[in-house]
Design a protein with these regions (language model features):
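Acidic-basic catalytic patches of nuclease active cores, encompassing PD-(D/E)XK
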Residues: 1-23
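Active-site beta-strand termini and strand-to-loop segments that position acidic
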Residues: 27-42, 46-49
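Short, flexible loop/turn elements at secondary-structure junctions
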Residues: 29-31, 60-62, 81, 97
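A general structural signal for short secondary-structure junctions and capping/turn motifs
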Residues: 18-19, 45-48, 82-87
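Conserved catalytic cores of phosphodiester-cleaving nucleases, focusing on short active-site segments
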Residues: 27, 36, 52-64
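Mg2+/Mn2+-dependent nuclease catalytic core
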Residues: 62-87
Length: 139
């Protein structure tokens, strides 16, 4: 995406924290809800307001059935990503087709208009070690 999108960059942790503070976003809750930014000014140090940049959430595909972006794209989206997308005018969803070497960037309203279907999926992390028998819950 760096080669395709003018002004795209992946901010450092400190840069990300300063942007979140500027926009009134809880960094601890949403720290992983943005992949990069697109600068609308010439340099990161010139960012003064939300109008100076866009938050970019990147979703990639190499699907053969996707001939023209964004049509036919399939991706996962966390609740936090979608909540931030809905609440921030300077948040963009960017779908990158790695085979076509193209991207499509959209705002929340366009995203809503393009959804064909949407379902909730839970992500489960199991314990990393076995519990002793006396620590197991009673059934």
């Amino acid at each position: 995406l760096r080669e395709l999108m003018d002004g795209f960059m992946v901010p450092t942790k400190e840069q990300r924290q300063s942007l979140y503070k500027l926009c009134g976003i809880d960094y601890r809750k949403y720290s992983r809800s943005v992949d990069g930014i697109q600068l609308l000014v010439s340099d990161f140090n010139k960012v003064r307001s939300e109008e100076d940049f866009l938050f970019i959430e990147v979703k990639t595909t190499n699907a053969k059935n996707v001939k023209k972006l964004p049509y036919g794209a399939f991706f996962g989206f966390t609740q936090n990503e979608e909540d931030l997308f809905k609440s921030k005018d300077n948040y963009r969803l960017c779908i990158v087709h790695t085979g076509l070497k193209e991207y499509y960037s959209m705002g929340y309203e366009e995203y809503l208009s393009l959804i064909q279907n949407k379902r909730v999926q839970y992500q489960i992390n199991l314990r990393s070690e076995q519990l002793d028998v006396e620590d197991l819950p009673e059934l």
